[in-house]
């Protein structure tokens, strides 16, 4: 019996080690999950503070109220060479969505966080300014200009559609119904 004692003690020691390391790994995983949740909360708060700030909202609202007949009219009234205030507002809003789109594309931000913080705004602004952005892509800034903003708006459009923000057949007069030709041009 005594000859088995070292084997039993070794087995008990090994079992204790395995249990200890399992406990350490479990605690580390729980700490990592808490840290991820904290980062998600901080990121969500940061995005909400940016997009919910008075300055951003003022710029956003003013961009939704600009009026133009066609691209030439837009350029005469709002191009950066004639209206630096409008340009600054556009750049502030567009770049916020461009950066959020980059984070989404790279998998660095949760799409639910973005949907809650930016979905309707980016869809509306993209829908309104897509022809202007296309003009700048073709004439001045190249095909990749605001590609992450476009990606974000397209992904948010899909989520809006899945959640009932867009009516079936685009015929119920919902706010986004008028934008379907931008996001689904073949329909």
Region annotations inferred by a language model:
Residues 14, 21, 33, 83-86, ...:
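Residues at structural and domain junctions
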Residues 1-5, 10, 179-187:
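Basic/polar N-terminal segments that are highly enriched at the extreme N-terminus
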